[in-house]
């Protein structure tokens, strides 16, 4: 994060008004580091809900995700160095204790950063040599006197008897006469396996220096490379193919809904630069191609980190939540690459298209129950039958949020009565852009997805983890149940396409006493015709074959228990289907 060392430089230029403005901005930055964690903890304790990608999601300056055993960790700005963890990359929980006990810190910091009060900034963590190397920033408001330190631990599990943070002292420090500012550390390895540290802020820009891979400290601080200048900070470098990509932040940080922070990128064939944007402008000359900026209620994103697992790259970053008066939040975006090998950062995890949505718990699919495609129809889980009413069209409305419409009739999935409350049900309705008709989709570590209603952020689940077909989907607080996880498959309707059949009548409706009649009407049927009745578990409970002519109706006389049933009418002409309710 910025440090107001730039204030002195502006006064030397004789521009006191700019200096005062910069100092005010720096006060906001420093203050936000202190109040952000307090705001988050207060909100978390007051709400007492666990939400999809959220849970304890208050975060500022998050580190790269690092994994210890089966648990994912992120460290953020805060007193003592605040940590948060997740087992699925969806729900996050505060760590039980900070790296350093609140109110304490390594004694060497007092000499390097007089006035330091224990609020550490923008940490970064990397696993190497059998232990975790945690880099942290120490600074104070209104000063360019700063330092980056290092602590190590063999495990991130606080319950382990081997859990112990050991401080390794200073990595790099700066003083009032320095031309760079020692904050915002980040690490990367080049193609030759060399380890590098990038750091710096608005004052002096971004620098890179090589580290000893065993100690994690600089090989030669006298050898440094200037990578970016002109109001930059929060650097991070990754390698893809033959290029290195330097991500930076420009704009105003730490001002809540008024933040203009945005992530930019340049690339180079060498780890030491020069880094050029898409237009060929050097990041040392103010260049930078924007890849993540304010969009909707996601305001001022910054401090990116990249974590790859199972072929997917998660981009950790913070943003200011417009729906919550600018509270800082953690978000995970998705890294993709365009045809010219430039990075694309998006919160969209699902491409536009038609999908079948399958429960990880029951194996059943989202189903517009009744297959009529009318407003108010329940969205339930049903046995997979390749029906049109089991196909769903996904359309991104931005920021990982989607409109989901049924292939039969085009009506949208919505939360009934736009309720944000527990147990609210899903149904079909005409899309009008309401928040209760939009769903935020997050990707869990196992490749499944979580659907959260934008209106209240509760997630879609099969109530009670039911295995029964016909159970209407509803909302609940996220708890990690497989009944809240969904997989997406390409929507493939069988060759004998199931369809809405207004000409196929079944009466009476609802069916009583297990007897009903199928009216063949003016259907064109060829070959042998088969009528099948399947129960809610997909089991065949009745079948009959007949020649279509001269027969114009079929009577099914079978004692059926109360419930929902699927009637199939098949012939050489195709497959027709309809759901019935037996009372």
Task: Indicate where each model-derived feature is located.
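Carbohydrate-active catalytic/glycan-binding domains of CAZyme proteins
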Residues: 1, 51-354, 391-393, 438
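Bacterial N-terminal signal peptides
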Residues: 35-48
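Hydrophobic beta-strand positions
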Residues: 85, 187-188, 268, 336, ...
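Solvent-exposed strand-loop boundary residues in beta-sheet-rich modules
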Residues: 87-90, 154-156, 214, 269-271, ...
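Lectin-like carbohydrate-binding module/patch detector with strong preference for beta-trefoil
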Residues: 351-493
